[in-house]
Amino acid sequence: MIVTTTNSIEGKQIEQYLGLVSGEVILGANVVRDFLASITDIIGGRSGTYESKLAEGREMAVQEMVKKARNMGANAVIGVDLDFETLRDGMMMCIATGTAVKLKE
């Protein structure tokens, strides 16, 4: 499955647009992790804990989006956009959206 942020795929012709597809994931961060991450942020370093959480959320959201696209009969997702939102109580939401398409073989 081809997944791209562009609206077309070089060398490929879109046979059919199947519609909007998305994957949503909500992840929680625990209090100890938040505390340690805040110490890292205070001393000026990067928060590896949060970076890995972001990467995990992104990957899970994209995987869910791809699964839904396959179920629609797609062999590619174009125009992919990723969005991250922080929710209360240390929760984070990751959303991947795109257009499921069928490419000519």
Curated annotation (Swiss-Prot):
Top-rank taxon, per record: Bacteria
Coiled coil stretches, renumbered: none
Family, per entry: Belongs to the UPF0145 family.
Name under which the protein is recorded: UPF0145 protein Aflv_1588
Lineage: Bacteria, Bacillati, Bacillota, Bacilli, Bacillales
